[in-house]
Design a protein with these regions (language model features):
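Nucleotide-activated sugar donor-binding and catalytic core shared by glycosyltransferases
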Residues: 1-197, 201-322
């Protein structure tokens, strides 16, 4: 969770954690429970259908803004920072009502509509990717992603029997799950260990093999990253964390719905920079797995380093609150 990693950096700079308030939903709360900060849980309305969703549910939007403003108005808020495009319009309005500076972190190559609209109010937009599109370029500062720095490349060790991690994002991926099923039926699977994050509410695969373990969801990604040598997954904003750790990725970008704009562009960026490979078929997947595996054995698996934004973003926010 980017905000958790950012809070840790702010604390290192000298920020009193009691001066930080996080507005989140139930899903985000569980990631922040071990931090000594104020957390306000809300079911604030956020549109997943663009501007139309906000227009059709305008009363819900107003209620959410009033609710959050009521909680924050006596807390002397000087900075509002958001990492989520869906909630960005509410955060933008709240910043105006509280007379606070507003910052956005854009986690994809192609900015979502929520961040694009909210950028009108933002002082700055911190981008994870270079050349971020669909947003006010004059306000964009390329910082790199916010990642978990408790792990570094030195902590990612090559296993005697290489391990492939399959993950389809927080909600899982039917396509990736299907590829796992096919892979476990192939002769190739015996050469690897498999860690599969199937996603909640996804159909569990009936795989009985000593080299296969499956999870609905993983809360501590550190454990997952330390287990794997190759990552097969989507191309969301989190793919930059694997790049930071030097884990080669096989990318299967989602091409439908709200992620259809940014995931293919994210994947192309990662491939162009040498952090991963895009595949479109199961056959392509097996070819790339073999290529990467042979690269490990020949010592040709070093990935280029990636710039991260933890410190740069934290310093900018810290300067505004001291």
């Amino acid at each position: 969770l980017p905000v958790k990693n950012l809070i840790k950096e702010l604390e290192k700079l000298g920020t009193n954690l009691h001066d930080i308030v996080v507005v989140s939903d139930d899903r985000g709360q569980k990631y922040l429970e071990n931090l000594n900060i104020n957390i306000y849980i809300t079911k604030a309305y956020s549109s997943q259908n663009g501007i139309l969703g906000y227009l059709l549910n305008f009363p819900k939007l107003i209620r959410s803004i009033k609710e959050i403003r009521k909680f924050l108005r006596n807390k002397n808020i000087s900075v509002v920072f958001t990492t989520g495009a869906y909630i960005a319009p509410i955060a933008a309005v709240i910043s105006v009502l509280l007379n606070a500076k507003f910052y956005i972190q854009e986690q994809n190559v192609y900015a979502g509509l929520g961040n694009k609209v909210s950028a009108i109010i933002a002082k700055s937009i911190f981008s994870s990717f270079e050349d971020t599109k669909n947003i006010n370029e004059k306000k964009v500062i390329h910082t790199g992603p916010i990642v978990n720095t408790s792990l570094t490349r030195k902590d990612i060790l090559l296993h005697e029997k290489q391990t492939i991690g399959f993950i389809g994002g927080s909600q899982g991926s039917e396509q990736i799950n299907q590829y796992v099923d096919e892979f476990m039926k192939s002769e190739l699977h015996t050469d690897f260990n498999i860690v599969h994050v199937a996603g909640k509410n996804k159909t569990n695969l009936e795989i009985d093999s000593n080299n296969y373990e499956s999870f609905d969801f993983i809360e501590e990604m550190d454990d997952f990253y330390k287990k794997i040598d190759i990552l097969v997954g989507r191309a969301g904003g989190g793919s930059l964390e694997a790049a930071y750790l030097g884990i080669p990725q096989i990318l299967i970008p989602y091409k439908y719905g709200t992620t259809s704009s940014h995931q293919p562009l994210n994947a192309k960026y990662l491939e162009d920079k040498g952090y991963g490979f895009i595949v479109n078929t199961f056959e392509d997947l097996t070819i790339k797995i073999n290529e990467i595996s042979k690269g490990f054995k020949s010592g040709k698996s070093n990935l280029p380093n990636i710039t991260i934004g933890n410190l740069m973003i934290s310093k900018e926010l810290y300067e505004q609150i001291v």
